[in-house]
């Protein structure tokens, strides 16, 4: 009965052309779907640091509150705090766990959470778990956010949460304007800087990009699995926030901590981003890609991030399959992740790509769209 039920549901997914399956990235010559924006996952120094961390064991053996707290964890948290210019930080097992754990711990029943309509699924899930009241404001629409805040300012606790860089379009939230608004309404701002850390603000992230100083009511969440090139998540803010999360954030309390090797590699990655300004090469590639992609008509507006939505509608799946035949990995993004008619190939570039890579991609898409 159970097997048959699953088969029926899977067939329904296939019938709607929404079926997903795993692919091995080693099968491709050119990867345009990676989040490894700075190429740090394959950096020799990062790998050496990872191997050094193995001396403390292959696994962490427990949660941070039991047997899984190492000096390396606390060292990484210090490195992140300095990097993000905050008082303290806390490392989570993933970016998803960080968003879910922070939001569900801070927002309670009777509180109000205002969320951008295009926020990541982990933010949406965190709000659901919190049982707080939720209102959605139009995408990056500051005026709409003000209107909603004005109508609901009687709430004692208000949290505004937004992605910094939106993962499907690569556009950037107007954090500078939102930061001013939350002060006026005595609200808290949670920023998911997953795609901004290592990319914007000379690598420091979105606050630095907008020249907004970290403050008591701004919380920065990030991931180690994108530009940093390892795995895990983190949150940065005031000391009392971190102490509160250690005692109240369920995804932190009840998760096995990250292995020492991952922590060691992450420390090295942050050092490299800080000292070598790795985002410089990425910025050059973004300028190059902007020109080529726009000339070929794949984008209308230039980007300041490495994410490009090539919107082809329903043709996106077939074009993606065609790219695979040419050794190019470009993931098709379909409904319900994006609206119907807005299906796209999400192209992400890295500091390791070269101009000829962009040219090759454009040439093959041109042929596939004739």
Swiss-Prot record:
The keyword Transferase applies. Pyridoxal 5'-phosphate binds at residues 95-96, 167, 192-195, 223-226. The keyword Cell membrane does not apply. The modification N6-(pyridoxal phosphate)lysine is found at residue 226. Pathway: Cofactor biosynthesis; biotin biosynthesis. Gene3D superfamilies: Aspartate Aminotransferase, domain 1, Type I PLP-dependent aspartate aminotransferase-like (Major domain). Its EC number is 2.3.1.47. GO terms for biological process: biotin biosynthetic process. Substrate binds at residues 20, 120, 337. It catalyses: 6-carboxyhexanoyl-[ACP] + L-alanine + H(+) = (8S)-8-amino-7-oxononanoate + holo-[ACP] + CO2. Its cofactor is pyridoxal 5'-phosphate. Keywords: Biotin biosynthesis, Pyridoxal phosphate, Transferase. GO terms for molecular function: 8-amino-7-oxononanoate synthase activity; pyridoxal phosphate binding. InterPro entries: Aminotrans_II_pyridoxalP_BS, Aminotransferase_I/II_large, AON_synthase_class-II, AONS_Archaea/Proteobacteria, PyrdxlP-dep_Trfase, PyrdxlP-dep_Trfase_major, PyrdxlP-dep_Trfase_small. NCBIfam families: bioF (TIGR00858). Belongs to the class-II pyridoxal-phosphate-dependent aminotransferase family. BioF subfamily. Catalyzes the decarboxylative condensation of pimeloyl-[acyl-carrier protein] and L-alanine to produce 8-amino-7-oxononanoate (AON), [acyl-carrier protein], and carbon dioxide. Homodimer. This is Putative 8-amino-7-oxononanoate synthase. It comes from Methanococcus vannielii (strain ATCC 35089 / DSM 1224 / JCM 13029 / OCM 148 / SB).
